[in-house]
Amino acid sequence: MKKIFFTSFILLLLDQTLKIWIKTSFFLGEEYKIFDWFIIHFTENNGMAFGIEFGGYTGKKILTLFRIIVVGVGIMYIFNLTKKRISDGALIALGLIIGGAIGNIIDSSFYGIIFNESYNNIASFMPDGGGYSSFLHGKVVDMFYFPLINSHFPSWLPIWGSEHFIFFRPVFNIADAGISVGIFMIFLFYRKEFN
C-alpha cells in the first residue's frame, strides 16, 4: 500500500504544481514552444477526455460525483487487492491511475472556487471576487501538446487530399499521462495479477 500511496502522492504533487503554475502564469490559449513537436499550450477542459462534455451544468456535477465514486470504489478494490501478493510494478501502475484520477478530480471540484477566469487575464489564486464557478464545476487544466506529425495528406487521396493533418492533437496533463501509463502497464505487463 505504501508504494501505491507514494506513487500517487508524487504524481499528484507534480500534477498540481504544474497546473497551478500554468493557471497563474499563462493566458488561456497561450503557448510556449519547447520543440516543434513539444508545446506547452494552456487549455481548460469542462468535461471528459478530449473535451467531450456531458449534459451542461447538471451533467458536469454528475460527472464529477461519478469520478469521485469510481475513485473511492477503486481505492477499496486496491485495498482488498493488496491483501494478496502482487508485484511492485502493478502497485506502481495502480498508484499512477489513482493519483491521476485524484489530480483531475481536484481540478473539477475546486478550481472553480479558488481561481478566477483565464480568458482575458492570467488567473489569480483565491481572488477577492471569488472563483469562476462553484464546487464540482471547475475546469481541468491541460498543457502538454505533442504535434509529432504536422503535415498535409497527399493530394492523390480522394477524400482528404491536401488537407492539413496533425498526428497527436490531444492536449493533456500529468494526471492524464499517469492514468494512461498505469493502464498501459497493467494491460501490457500485469494483467494476470488482476484476474
Question: Model features per residue range: what roles?
Answer:
Residues 1-195:
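Alpha-helical transmembrane bundles and membrane-interface segments of multipass inner-membrane proteins
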